[in-house]
């Protein structure tokens, strides 16, 4: 099977082309994407070929996405066709259909849109940073940079009890 996908052929050369979609492997979930998200810093570095930040060309950018399970591999437990899922998986995001390891997929709760669920991986990244800092009630925190990860991190530091929480961009 084939689907449309954005493929970075080389630095500064992304193209919308047909890409192959193999059957999912034993521990993979095949997802039909409903929403993908551009993580500006990471994807700009990848597409522009920034040293030490770029996968080998060609590659499919995008790792923040949400959609519906189409098929599951033979060893997958807990997911079935029709499930709404969000995923954090490199080389899958900006394409119509992709295979994702079952450990990189989470169910989307009822009432959450695909567009909001696509932010799951960026929320996970910012929350991990806040947890590693082990913020305690009343500690002050400053965030340098207010991209989406910085904004989410500031929200999580506030919820963790940081005061004051200072945002600098």
Where are these regions (language model features)?
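Glycine/charged-rich beta-loop-alpha catalytic/anionic-binding loops adjacent to active sites
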Residues: 103-114
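Glycine-rich beta-strand-centered segment in the early N-terminal region that forms part
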Residues: 22-38, 46-92
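Extreme N-terminal starter segment of soluble prokaryotic enzymes
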Residues: 2-4
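Mid-domain Rossmann-like dinucleotide-binding core that forms the NAD(H)/NADP(H) cofactor-binding site
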Residues: 115-169
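Generic structural motif
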Residues: 67-69, 98, 124, 141
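Short, conserved catalytic or interaction motifs in soluble domains
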Residues: 74, 110, 135
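A structural motif shared across PLP-dependent enzymes of the aminotransferase-like
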Residues: 89-102
